[in-house]
Amino acid sequence: RFKKIRRLGALPGLTSKRPRSGSDLKNQLRSGKRSQYRIRLEEKQKLRFHYGLTERQLLKYVHMAGKAKGSTGQVLLQLLEMRLDNILFRLGMASTIPGARQLVNHRHILVNGRIVDIPSYRCKPRDIITTKDKERSKVLIQNYIASSSHEELPNHLTIDPLQYKGLVNQIIDSKWVGLKINELLVVEYYSRQT
């Protein structure tokens, strides 16, 4: 994990740790000139590691984004941001995306009153995300909400920490994506692969 954040920069979805300010400068001096391929590859890896996806999963999302209307890069980010595990992370119900994925896999999360155990479940506007009524589930979420840094919540989400309930208001706008990334480089990377 630390090698990844040292090489690619801050990845809030993977870990809350940040790279040291001097380490990035050393890497750039040591590596010399970066090729265009390397720049595109690093952007793709940043996206992959932040959202915790395999290469195959990311490729599937790129193909889905390519078929949809609109800018492929923007649609790709919207698809990734509307995943259930990412929404739990952005609501502050989990400290990292892998932590959110574990909550979903262990069946602690309900979407619109139904248990969902698929982390890649695509949330839609007006979805209500809650925890199970069991005490263990509520304690887990309560600990995460209490320890989460209360950064500004994106416009497309609302949380009620007392009821352990989150609401998806709308599809995310690209300016609220929690990662500094040039999504066009990711699309370029895959368009050159085929």
From Swiss-Prot:
Main localization category: plastid
GO biological process: ribosomal small subunit biogenesis; translation
Gene Ontology cellular-component annotations: chloroplast; small ribosomal subunit
Any matching Pfam family: S4
Localization per Swiss-Prot or TrEMBL: Plastid, Chloroplast
Signal sequence interval, chain numbering: none
InterPro entries assigned: Ribosomal_uS4, Ribosomal_uS4_bac-type, Ribosomal_uS4_CS, Ribosomal_uS4_N, S4_RNA-bd, S4_RNA-bd_sf
Listed SMART domains: Ribosomal_S4 (SM01390), S4 (SM00363)
S4 RNA-binding domain location: 82-143
Keywords recorded for this protein, A-Z: Chloroplast, Plastid, Ribonucleoprotein, Ribosomal protein, RNA-binding, rRNA-binding
CDD domains: S4 (cd00165)
GO molecular function: rRNA binding; structural constituent of ribosome
NCBIfam families in alphabetical order: PRK05327.1 (NF003717), rpsD_bact (TIGR01017)
Subunit structure: Part of the 30S ribosomal subunit. Contacts protein S5. The interaction surface between S4 and S5 is involved in control of translational fidelity.
Function, in words: One of the primary rRNA binding proteins, it binds directly to 16S rRNA where it nucleates assembly of the body of the 30S subunit. With S5 and S12 plays an important role in translational accuracy.
Recorded family membership: Belongs to the universal ribosomal protein uS4 family.
Full protein name: Small ribosomal subunit protein uS4c
Species the sequence originates in: Cypella sp. (strain Porto Alegre 027)
Encoding gene per record: rps4
